[in-house]
Amino acid sequence: MRLHFKAMESYGEGNNASQAMVADKVELIQMLFDGLLDSLVTARGHIQRGSIEDKNKSLVRAGRIVIGLQGALDLEKGGDLARNLHELYSYVTRRLVYVNAHNDLAVLEEVQTLMGDIRQAWRDVPNLLPKSTPAPGVPMSAAMH
């Protein structure tokens, strides 16, 4: 994931490119959270149906996403927020292992709630970003992507 961020950072110059880069990062993180939450819902269904192999695949996928989110944190620049998220992601990873071993739907619900709350916070991020006009020669549709 850091490679993707590095690639985006090397794109363009100026305020609009910088804002687009931040928006792209936010969108990527939102997509990761969507995939994580989808995997958790899928795992719940597999647990309820007793489909152990499919449950395992869903929980492993969820765990990989959490580890990816954790690895994308910049602990130096992110300060307390990044450190707190790092600890939360470690906790969630341990809870996913527990769910996988014990088929515990209550613990799965706990993880879904925690990650759903974080996802909602990321949903609100675009509203906090400054609005800008596209750079000269950049079509409005391109500036929005």
Regions found by a protein language model. Give the residues of each.
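N-terminal intrinsically disordered, cationic/polar leader segments
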Residues: 1-42, 48-49, 54-60, 67, ...
